[in-house]
């Protein structure tokens, strides 16, 4: 239950004051939990609310359901599939336009730099390169900070939290969508070490959410058939479908997009949703294929077939894409290394984001200064490091002194018929660098020193770049970093490994993805779809399982850590061990506000003005019942509708039998507003005479809310709360001689900050168990390494 947030200093506990600033949470929560919570949404702190997935079964719902014709049901089903088709078309077009813009903007910049380098104008080339990068990133940061802070970052933590039941202002607004697209184009084109995949997930979710708004009065879109989707359940399904479509648009991986939404994003899944999501991602794949063929003839500038990080290894050097049983230990080693590097990557990312938050909270100017500093550092690193790399002769000389057998390789300062392997990775967009690393039959193309330098730079820049206030993704930089260390491992092993270096680069990407994102099935399918080679499937599966298992012993996935850092109240699918020691009665806090079945208007107005609760128990008392009995649960939004309609009674009595609810109210009167929008009581003005009247709440009360007994374990209640998708869970007493309602459980009652704030004695047991778990896992892997060494 929620109201306005208190000042930040009121939420800081004594223990937190004694902790170093870089280990405190970004946003502090109240232990009493009777207030609205706030979280970082994009790059701005915003109040957050929970979503209502429960069907409100009251008299109005029953009448509307009985009068619904067969044509309405058919129209509803057809509309759902039509929306899926439209989401697929628009997401595919937007994905193509983003890649087209990035390829041309970045390509023009790199072409200008290469031209200056060829004419030995080295300093001019650097200033052009650094100046263009700075201008592009400042533009992306400025529009993000000024127009829509919710568009900052990848957006995946916010989408994942939304699909878990957390709502926040403007995460799917039209402004956020526009800033996400334009800002991501500028950020990726600025040579910042970020990607397009995460923002594409958020973009697809924005497109779907716009369809799920159920129309707009501002723009005159008020057709009746649009109102079918003015509820959180259908919006949740559409956002899930849109997020999967975004993955499909980023990687041309339709099956991987469906599995990504299922494994990583969605908290609730139904078989019917799989069909619709698969249909949408298939539409995206077809749209992208059409545009790629259209641009294959050079009509799209520098785009060609690029921009969608697809590298087909199935038809080139098939004899090199083989492996044997003796290569399995190498695959295991790659998985373990990827897990350790991924867990450390997550740890460093959290520390950097904490430091950046201290800078960003000082205002817009500091956000832009931080972006400028990161841009200058990136430009100096990207342009300066290739000077220390040796020039290598081209395997096959091409026209104008270029390497004819190598794609997208840079000559930089080298003489004709030579190339700079480090510049070929640094001075390319990430997609082309990935293609270069995945290329088979190129074992002698890179120098080990160049690989080590690029790995360290990619690792560090990936950590430093994400916290900049601009739309930025993690997926592609992680793929690139993993591919680099995969090739480096293959070089270090030398003749001890018969695996092609391009194949090991793919396995390195998989292991680093498993170590950071902690996804297995979806990442496996995405990699197979990217490389178009099923021969890789067993090795990719093995390396993902190993990397995820090992990395889980250190910390959580990067998206989960970011959600916790932002303060988004995400409910995990499993309960913490200490929750089994508590009952729901141990965490319910008061005071509880309730209404009579026939309540005075003035009392309702007073409660709505003095509290921020979003639901209230309705209790029938004499003369409407022989003893106090729970009738149901009424929502705050529904009470506001009743007050605006002014359907009041002069005395404390129920509506007469001839009273027709359908004649005075329509189901659309109680439709849920769009994401992040809340009705307020401030706009309700009543006369003193109306304040003395009464309103019958029975026809508008959910008469069958979910209830639990106060003795139920908190862990069991959490499973029920999450699986059903509840916003409110009523707690009833064990004995009959008490009040019919003990309290109401909401999402924030299950948060560790709230539970451990009420019962701090459990805190030591929680961390003690965690330390034992890590020690046991570490001992297990030490013994495993010893056994492998003895076998060898």
Describe every region a protein language model picked out:
Residues 719-782:
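C-terminal interaction modules of eukaryotic adaptor/scaffold proteins
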Residues 629-630, 741:
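Residue-level detector of beta-propeller blades
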Residues 779-792:
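Extreme C-terminal disordered tails of eukaryotic proteins encode short linear targeting/docking signals used
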Residues 700-703, 707-726:
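Structured, soluble regulatory/oligomerization domains located on the cytosolic or IMS-facing side
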Residues 619, 708-711, 732-733:
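Glycine-rich beta-to-alpha transition loops that act as phosphate-gripper elements at the mouths
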Residues 2-624, 630-647, 651-687, 693-702, ...:
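Alpha-helical transmembrane segments and immediately membrane-proximal extracytoplasmic
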């Amino acid at each position: 239950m929620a109201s306005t947030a208190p000042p930040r200093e009121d939420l800081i506990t004594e223990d937190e004051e004694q902790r170093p600033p870089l280990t405190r949470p970004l946003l502090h929560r109240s232990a009493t939990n009777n207030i609205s919570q706030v979280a970082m949404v994009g790059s701005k702190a915003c109040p957050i609310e929970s979503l209502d997935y429960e069907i409100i079964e009251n008299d109005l719902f029953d009448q509307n359901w009985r009068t619904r014709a067969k044509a309405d049901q058919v129209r509803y089903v057809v509309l759902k599939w039509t929306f899926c088709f439209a989401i697929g078309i628009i997401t595919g077009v937007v994905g193509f336009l983003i890649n087209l813009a990035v390829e041309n903007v970045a390509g023009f910049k790199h072409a200008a730099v290469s031209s200056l380098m060829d004419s030995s104008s080295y300093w001019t080339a650097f200033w052009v390169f650094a100046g263009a990068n700075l201008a592009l990133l400042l533009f992306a940061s400025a529009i993000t900070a000024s127009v829509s802070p919710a568009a900052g970052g990848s957006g995946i933590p916010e989408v994942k939290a939304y699909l878990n039941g957390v709502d926040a202002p403007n995460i799917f607004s039209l402004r956020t969508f526009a800033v996400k697209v334009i800002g991501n184009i500028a950020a990726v084109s600025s040579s910042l070490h970020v990607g397009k995949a995460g923002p594409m997930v958020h973009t697809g979710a924005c497109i779907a959410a716009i369809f799920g708004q159920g129309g707009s009065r501002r723009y005159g879109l008020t057709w009746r058939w649009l109102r079918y989707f003015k509820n959180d359940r259908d919006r949740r399904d559409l956002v899930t479908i849109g997020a999967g479509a975004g993955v499909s648009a980023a990687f041309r991986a339709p099956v991987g997009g469906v599995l990504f939404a299922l494994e990583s994003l969605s908290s609730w899944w139904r078989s019917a949703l799989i069909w619709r999501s698969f249909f949408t991602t298939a539409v995206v794949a077809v749209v992208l294929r059409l545009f790629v063929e259209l641009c294959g003839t050079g009509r799209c500038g520098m785009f060609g077939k690029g921009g969608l990080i697809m590298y087909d290894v199935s038809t080139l050097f098939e004899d090199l894409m083989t492996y044997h049983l003796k290569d399995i230990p190498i695959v295991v080693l790659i998985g373990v290394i990827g897990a350790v590097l991924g867990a450390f990557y997550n740890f460093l990312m959290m520390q950097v984001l904490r430091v950046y938050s201290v800078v960003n909270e000082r205002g817009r100017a500091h956000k832009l200064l931080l972006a400028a500093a990161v841009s200058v550092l990136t430009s100096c690193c990207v342009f300066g490091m290739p000077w220390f790399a040796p020039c290598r002769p081209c395997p096959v000389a091409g026209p104008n002194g270029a390497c004819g057998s190598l794609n997208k390789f840079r000559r930089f300062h080298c003489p004709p018929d030579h190339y700079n392997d480090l510049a070929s990775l640094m001075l390319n967009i990430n997609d082309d660098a990935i293609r270069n690393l995945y290329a088979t039959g190129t074992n002698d193309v890179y120098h080990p020193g160049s690989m080590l330098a690029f790995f360290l730079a990619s690792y560090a820049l990936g950590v430093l770049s994400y916290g900049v206030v601009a739309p930025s993704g993690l997926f592609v930089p992680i793929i690139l970093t993993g591919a680099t260390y995969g090739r480096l491992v293959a070089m270090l092993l030398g003749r001890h490994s018969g695996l092609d270096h391009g194949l090991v680069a793919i396995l390195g990407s998989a292991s680093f993805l498993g170590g950071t994102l902690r996804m297995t099935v979806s990442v496996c399918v995405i990699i197979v779809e990217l490389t178009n080679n099923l021969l890789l499937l067993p090795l990719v599966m093995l390396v993902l399982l190993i990397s995820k298992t090992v990395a889980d012993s250190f910390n959580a996935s990067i998206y989960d850590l970011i959600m916790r850092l932002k303060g988004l109240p995400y409910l995990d699918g499993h309960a913490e061990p200490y929750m089994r020691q508590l009952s729901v009665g141990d965490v319910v806090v008061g005071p509880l506000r309730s209404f009579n079945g026939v309540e005075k208007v003035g009392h309702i107005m007073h409660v709505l003005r003095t509290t921020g609760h979003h639901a209230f128990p309705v209790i029938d008392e004499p003369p409407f019942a022989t003893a106090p009995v729970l009738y149901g649960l009424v929502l705050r939004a529904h009470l506001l509708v009743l007050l605006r309609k002014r359907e009041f009674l002069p005395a404390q009595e129920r509506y007469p039998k001839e009273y027709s609810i359908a004649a005075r109210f329509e189901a659309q009167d109680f439709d849920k507003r769009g994401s992040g929008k809340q009705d307020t009581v401030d706009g309700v003005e009543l006369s003193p005479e109306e304040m003395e009247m009464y309103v019958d709440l029975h026809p508008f009360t959910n008469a069958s809310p979910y209830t639990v007994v106060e003795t139920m374990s908190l862990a069991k209640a959490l499973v029920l709360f999450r699986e059903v998708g509840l916003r409110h869970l009523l707690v009833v007493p064990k004995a009959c001689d008490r009040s019919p309602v003990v309290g109401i459980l909401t999402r924030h009652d299950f948060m560790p900050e709230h539970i451990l704030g009420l019962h701090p004695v459990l805190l030591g047991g929680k961390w003690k168990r965690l330390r034992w778990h890590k020690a046991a896992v570490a001992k297990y892997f030490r013994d495993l390494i010893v056994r492998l060494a003895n076998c060898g």
